[in-house]
Curated annotation (Swiss-Prot):
Keyword Nucleotide-binding attributed: no
InterPro entries: FA_synthesis, Phospholipid_synth_PlsX-like
UniProt entry keywords in alphabetical sequence: Cytoplasm, Lipid biosynthesis, Lipid metabolism, Phospholipid biosynthesis, Phospholipid metabolism, Transferase
The protein's name in its UniProt record: Phosphate acyltransferase
Pathway: Lipid metabolism; phospholipid metabolism
Gene Ontology BP terms: fatty acid biosynthetic process; phospholipid biosynthetic process
Reaction catalyzed: a fatty acyl-[ACP] + phosphate = an acyl phosphate + holo-[ACP]
A cellular component term, taken from the record's GO annotations: cytoplasm
HAMAP family: PlsX
Amino acid sequence: MIFSVDVMGFENDIREAINACRDFCKKNSDVKIILVGDKERIQKEIKSSDNFEIVHASEEIKMTDDPISIRKKTNSSMYKAIELVKENKADGVLSAGNTSCYVFLTFLILGKIPGITKCGFMPYMPTINGRGVNFLDVGANKECDATDLVNFARMGSIYIEKVRNVKNPKVGILNIGTEDNKGLSYHIEANKILKDVKNINYVGFVESRYLLEEKVDLIVSDGFVGNIALKALEGTFKTVLRSLLGTRKKPLFGWLWFLLSIPNLLTIKNKYDYKNNAGAIVLGLNKIAIKTHGSADYKQFYSSLRLLRDTVKADLINILKREFEKDNEGQ
């Protein structure tokens, strides 16, 4: 397996990405990594024992860039890393750069699988009992129709079954209530369609209060609502953790409680730490594209490389292509 990794344009030092790539290759002898970025800066960080290929990129997409302005940045590290996958010189791509630009360029360069109306941005979130849940879409599309939501359910179900090895994954649509008449017209229409799809384990609407309670394995939403829900969860977790840590500033009993709670606090922190399960797939593309956090460190790059490896190994793209070819055959 060959992966192209964009090591530029994110908020951390490039050594975080390079060190993660080095250690990942040591533990995965069947993986080769192409580092894409400023050759001079990369060479300062690599060791003589490293077996990396370097593709020089003279440009860098900044976090402040917008998708329209980067069309002509064909010499940027992000563009070149994605292009390597299109040219079949790599099996998948990973970047921690500007999210909106990355999603735009993957659409532009790699294209969609025939039959798929919209691609979606899908992360993984840990849940109470450790099973976890995927969330599609969380920002690639501000607006969706019923067909898009149905396709998200189909793609996400296949991904969870083939990559996460969850049999017969449960699927739900994020909504303001569980009754069939709740939500906007496209929610109601998608709900009706999915109830009749035999190869999807659809359980109906899911309210946001149950996102982390393992009622489903896949939450389906348009990207606008999905992004708000995801960021609300992230913010809530940080606030609760900060509040718990704040008890140590209180009198003796506060300190005593804090000291006794340290093991439990660490367990909770490790369980819900997104760094352990970093990386989101742009699902629906002709190739594998993974995006990690803009402030990614060693841990996040490493876990994102693991996701990239597992997705490529599962032969996900060919499975999705075969699934959506059936739609064309039926027309």
